[in-house]
């Protein structure tokens, strides 16, 4: 089996890792960073991903950030006359990470383990798998982020039994998972969370504060100005990060707006205590799922051996303090919160390929699954925090005499009424033979695979007629849509490659023109007028070609000029060699000339005596 990469597809940042020997290694992107912003931008038909896309977000309205928050929904982004689904945009980020891994490995990568928040529902998980497929990746496994973090933390601690609480506060989602580690088995006991809570929300409270203060002082509402909002977002994110290390930071945004008397500047000092006051309700919101996870696992805080913090937002001192206060234990600081999830995904990839042995991962389904029954109630078949993969069956009957069909309304959630839970899908079992109500026996079976994706079957036990459905939420893509998007992604990748090649060719041609001009000037009298004229003509021809759009013409003219410069250089070397040879010959002839000399014998003084 070829290399399987581990990917943390994050809301604000993503990361890719590979197993080297027994150790997971985070792969740096071309900019040298270990994480890549989950940002996609479109400009003049070109797609940009990562840091380069994030840098121009202020001036480019066609920039998409935090798309992960819309996974599993029918949300679409309209850009330059085309609609993009969250799956397509996420695929562009995955393609970028895939390319980073391929450049590092020097080989094609087509398999991956991708992480998702533990609290992602079926539709969100399916959307993530679809994104992988569009990016040209076979998703070997969808793994929960806190579980991946625990894998990375506990790989070298398999000898000891530990109960670990993973507190994962990322850019857009929040999860708490409790795992039991021992003898190479990583068993998830419970999970809880909030898919709409993360670092973006902490940024937002700062943005709201800045907007409010600026309005008080200048009477201008910056929230109505898109460009100003983007600048505020960048400043808020930076201030949040600064306040993890210092107690006060200065937010300075000159020319943020204009008033009657000219340009307006935003200049505000933000203290850590003020930020903590603004974010207090968000921090409190993280505590409820933490308590729920402990309750579901049947554990008290004193039974937790270790607390692992995951996600960039856990760097906020107030978050760390809240966790410490709630659990009564200092959080473990030995893992990098931005990278540990991707590293865990790489370890799971190693388990799949057989490179990591004696490790067993037992994950759970985060939400209860069931169907709607009479009275609009939800009847639960699989309780939340059930270990997966799993299967559960239950027999139901008809509600009316001679009922010819039954509607199976598949639900996910914890509320007693069907309407309060999430609809995963609906299907019908038809052709039920006429019979009094309560007589037909309809067996409904729920199957959840290792990725947490649900398959439901309904079977008439009297006729053995069967109908099944792999849950497709309203946002799920059909095979045809995925195939089209895969093709689009491949074409875009090819177009991007061609654009890069064109830029490289033009740069090389520009450099060659400069080189020729310099060479001709340096050689001066050492080349003939004819050679000089030929070089000038070929150089001018290439310059003219560079002004046009014909790539083949640029390539041809570049090759012609390269040939001329090579011939010129060869001639110069030849001339230099001849001159050197001639000099040596002249020196040799001088050395071989022998002159006669007169010698006179001089006797010693003693001989004179």
Curated annotation (Swiss-Prot):
Induction data: By stress conditions e.g. heat shock.
Alphabetical list of InterPro entries matching this protein: ATPase_NBD, Chaperone_DnaK, Heat_shock_70_CS, HSP70_C_sf, HSP70_peptide-bd_sf, Hsp_70_fam
Modification type Phosphothreonine: residues: 173
Region of interest called Disordered, as start-end residue ranges on this chain: 525-553, 574-609
Family named by the database record: Belongs to the heat shock protein 70 family.
Function (record text): Acts as a chaperone.
Protein name: Chaperone protein DnaK
Lineage of source species: Bacteria, Bacillati, Bacillota, Bacilli, Bacillales
Recorded name of the encoding gene: dnaK
């Amino acid at each position: 089996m070829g290399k399987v990469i581990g990917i943390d597809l994050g809301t604000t940042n993503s990361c890719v890792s590979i197993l080297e020997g027994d150790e997971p290694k985070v792969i740096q992107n071309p900019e040298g960073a270990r994480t890549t912003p989950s940002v996609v931008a479109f400009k003049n038909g070109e797609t940009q991903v990562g840091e380069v896309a994030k840098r121009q977000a202020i001036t480019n309205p066609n920039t998409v950030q935090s798309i992960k928050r819309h996974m599993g929904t029918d949300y679409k982004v309209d850009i330059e006359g085309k609609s993009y689904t969250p799956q397509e945009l996420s695929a562009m980020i995955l393609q970028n990470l895939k390319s980073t891994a391929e450049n590092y490995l020097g080989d094609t990568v087509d398999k991956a383990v991708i992480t998702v928040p533990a609290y992602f529902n079926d539709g969100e998980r399916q959307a993530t798998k679809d994104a992988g497929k569009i990016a040209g990746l076979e998703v070997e496994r969808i793994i929960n982020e806190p579980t991946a973090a625990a894998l990375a933390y506990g790989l070298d601690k398999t000898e000891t039994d530990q109960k670990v609480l993973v507190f994962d506060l990322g850019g857009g989602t929040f999860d708490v998972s409790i795992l039991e580690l021992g003898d190479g088995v990583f068993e998830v006991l419970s999970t809880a969370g909030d898919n709409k809570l993360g670092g973006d929300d902490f940024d937002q409270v700062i943005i709201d504060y800045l907007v409010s203060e600026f309005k008080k002082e200048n009477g201008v509402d910056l929230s109505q100005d898109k460009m100003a909002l983007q600048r505020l977002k960048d400043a808020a994110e930076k201030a949040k990060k600064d306040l993890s290390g210092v107690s006060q930071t200065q937010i300075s945004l000159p020319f943020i707006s204009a008033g009657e008397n000219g340009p307006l500047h935003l200049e505000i000092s933000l203290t850590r205590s003020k930020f903590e006051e603004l974010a207090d309700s968000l921090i409190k919101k993280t505590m409820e799922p933490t308590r729920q996870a402990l309750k579901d696992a049947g554990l008290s805080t004193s039974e937790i051996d270790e607390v692992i913090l995951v996600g960039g937002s856990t760097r906020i001192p107030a978050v760390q303090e809240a966790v410490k206060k709630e659990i009564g234990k200092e959080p473990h600081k030995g893992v990098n919160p931005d990278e540990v999830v991707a590293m865990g995904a790489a370890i799971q990839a190693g388990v799949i390929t057989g490179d990591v042995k004696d490790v067993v991962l037992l994950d759970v389904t985060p939400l209860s699954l069931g169907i709607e029954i009479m009275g609009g109630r939800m009847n639960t078949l699989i309780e939340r925090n059930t270990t997966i993969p799993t299967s559960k069956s239950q027999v139901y009957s008809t509600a009316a005499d001679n009922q010819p069909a039954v509607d199976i309304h598949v639900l996910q959630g914890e509320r007693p009424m069907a309407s309060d839970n999430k609809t995963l899908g609906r299907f019908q079992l038809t052709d039920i033979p006429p019979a009094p109500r309560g007589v037909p026996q309809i067996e409904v079976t729920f199957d959840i695979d290792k990725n947490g994706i649900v398959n439901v079957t309904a079977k008439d036990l009297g006729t053995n007629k069967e109908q099944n459905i792999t849950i497709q939420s309203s946002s799920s893509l059909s095979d045809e849509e995925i195939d089209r998007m895969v093709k689009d992604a491949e074409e875009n990748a090819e177009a991007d490659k061609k654009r890069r090649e064109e830029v490289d060719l033009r740069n090389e041609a520009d450099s060659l023109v400069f080189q020729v001009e310099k060479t001709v000037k340096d050689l001066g009298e050492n080349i003939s007028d004819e050679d000089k004229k030929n070089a000038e003509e070929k150089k001018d021809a290439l310059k003219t070609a560079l002004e046009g759009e014909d790539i083949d013409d640029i390539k041809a003219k570049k090759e012609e000029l390269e040939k001329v410069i090579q011939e010129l250089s060869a001639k110069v070397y030849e001339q230099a060699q001849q001159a050197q040879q001639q000099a040596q010959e002249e020196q040799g002839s001088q050395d071989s000339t022998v002159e006669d000399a007169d010698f006179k014998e001089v006797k010693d003084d003693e001989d004179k005596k």
